[in-house]
């Protein structure tokens, strides 16, 4: 599950991405959540306990792999993401590798 959407606007795509991931997790599926592109801003925002989507993030727990390292730096949210305990993913020349997830057998859904 890749979330590319920032929280600007209503944040509905971020919410749906988290809910769909949680649906898979509750069904016993191996689901991974990655925040990429502008979506790194969403992770920085929902990592804050005051955000209304924070509880969904906590329910997903270790299913959240983290955020694109390059994007986190570019969007100036690296410190918030790392400070909240999430990993920066940089396995493709500093960016997160979507190909790795495909090669590991995951179906990639984008929100």
Language-model-derived ranges and their functions:
Residues 1-3, 31-32, 64-66, 107-108:
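Structural motif
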Residues 1-15, 40-46:
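Short, glycine-rich nucleotide/cofactor-binding loops
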Residues 13-27:
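Histidine-anchored nucleotide/phosphate-binding helix
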Residues 20-23, 57, 80, 100-101:
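Hydrophobic/aromatic ligand-binding patch that stacks against planar heteroaromatic rings
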Residues 21, 31-37, 65-71:
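Short internal beta-strands
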Residues 43-50, 80:
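Glycine-rich loop at the start of a catalytic domain that most often binds anionic cofactors/ligands
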Residues 49-77:
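A glycine-rich helix N-cap at a beta->alpha junction
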Residues 79-111:
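C-terminal structural segments of small proteins and small subunits
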């Amino acid at each position: 599950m890749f979330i590319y959407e920032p929280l600007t606007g209503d944040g509905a795509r971020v919410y749906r991405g988290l809910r769909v991931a949680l649906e898979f997790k509750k069904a016993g599926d191996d689901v991974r959540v990655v925040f990429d592109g502008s979506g790194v801003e969403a992770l920085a925002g929902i990592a804050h306990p005051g955000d209304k989507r924070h509880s969904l993030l906590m329910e997903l727990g270790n299913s959240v792999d983290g955020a694109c390292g390059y994007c986190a730096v570019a969007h100036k949210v690296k410190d918030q993401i790392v400070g909240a305990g999430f990993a920066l993913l940089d396995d493709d020349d500093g960016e997160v590798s979507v190909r790795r997830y495909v090669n590991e057998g995951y179906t990639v859904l984008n929100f």
